Curated annotation (Swiss-Prot):
Keyword Chloroplast set for record: no
Subcellular location: Membrane; Mitochondrion; Cytoplasm
Naturally occurring in which organism (per UniProt): Rattus norvegicus (Rat)
Keyword entries, A-Z: Coiled coil, Cytoplasm, Membrane, Mitochondrion, Transmembrane, Transmembrane helix
InterPro entries the record matches: FAM210A/B-like, FAM210A/B-like_dom
Coiled-coil annotated spans: 233-272
Boundaries of every DUF1279 domain copy: 118-230
Lineage: Eukaryota, Metazoa, Chordata, Craniata, Vertebrata
Gene3D superfamilies on file: 6.10.140.1430
Similarity comment: family membership: Belongs to the FAM210 family.
GO cellular component: cytoplasm; membrane; mitochondrion
Compositionally biased tracts (Basic and acidic residues): 106-116
Function: May play a role in the structure and strength of both muscle and bone.
Record protein name field: Protein FAM210A
Region described as Disordered: 95-116, 247-273
């Protein structure tokens, strides 16, 4: 009994020492890149860091070879992709996203009706769009009609037509009405006030005169008629398709160049290893 007590104590000390060594090796493996293997039959540990010389036990070498074969047979994980394949995936996603956005842009373009015929928008918006599209026709028509309007109001004020009660009825401020009453140039100011009040009517007359003038000029060949909406949209679609195809070819060329560069880098790294 006295001989067995020290033997058991020595065995326990040996086991605790081996367990501590195993724990240290596992903790070290967490912070370094390498392959850590434990032989189950005996407490033999083989640690093989990447690209470093190591001393292995004969029984652990066989276990290490088997483990390497198993790791080579396993498919690579998603998070551990090689650099070339990772860049290829990113470039392909960029090409697909750019093509999808460019294909969506022509379909999003809506048909824009003629502002002279579109009555769904307000009068001011119609006047503004007509000015952008038919400015060369609208400006002379607007100047002529505005002169006629102002001349009519001025002639009425000279002939003694009292417009001040009408202005008071419309709700103009008293300061403006007093200026029109007491000013020496009351006729001109009265005509101008009536001219500004009649702005909606003036815009309507201008748009009507512009549409009539445009039709007259087109019928006599002085102004080119716009193409039908379908043909216009088809032409724009063909132009956008050509631009998209050119951009796709450029992106494909860039992608192939980058893939070749990455392949060369990967092959060079493999040769060095």
């Amino acid at each position: 009994m006295q001989w067995n007590v020290p033997r058991t104590m020595s065995r326990l000390a040996l086991r605790t020492f081996l367990e501590a060594q195993k724990a240290r090796l596992f903790d070290h493996h967490r912070s370094t890149k390498g392959l850590l293997l434990v032989h189950r039959g005996e407490y033999r540990v083989a640690w093989t860091p990447h690209l470093r010389k190591q001393w292995l036990h004969l029984s652990a070498v066989q276990c290490l070879a088997k483990q390497r074969n198993l790791l080579d047979a396993q498919p690579p994980q998603r998070g551990a992709l090689p650099q070339g394949r990772w860049e290829q995936d990113i470039l392909s996603k960029r090409v697909l996203s750019s093509s999808s956005t460019s294909q969506e842009t022509p379909s999003e373009k809506k048909e824009e009706p003629d502002p002279l015929q579109d009555k769904s928008i307000s009068l001011y918006q119609r006047f503004k769009k007509t000015f952008r599209q038919y400015g060369k026709v609208l400006i002379p028509v607007h100047l002529i009609t505005s002169g006629i309007w102002f001349g009519t109001f001025y002639y009425a004020s000279i002939k003694g037509v009292n417009v001040i009660p009408f202005l008071e009825f419309l709700g103009l401020p008293d300061s403006v009405v007093d200026i029109l009453k007491n000013s020496q140039s009351g006729n001109a100011l009265t005509a101008y006030a009536m001219f500004k009040i009649a702005t909606p009517a003036r815009y309507t007359v201008t748009l009507g005169g512009t549409s009539f003038t445009v039709k007259y000029l087109r019928s006599h060949g002085y102004m080119s008629t716009p193409p039908p909406v379908k043909e216009y949209l088809q032409g724009r679609m063909e132009e956008t398709k050509e631009l998209i195809s050119e951009k796709m070819e450029e992106t494909k060329d860039r992608l192939t160049e980058k893939l070749q560069e990455t392949k060369e880098k990967v092959s060079f790294k493999k040769k060095v290893e």
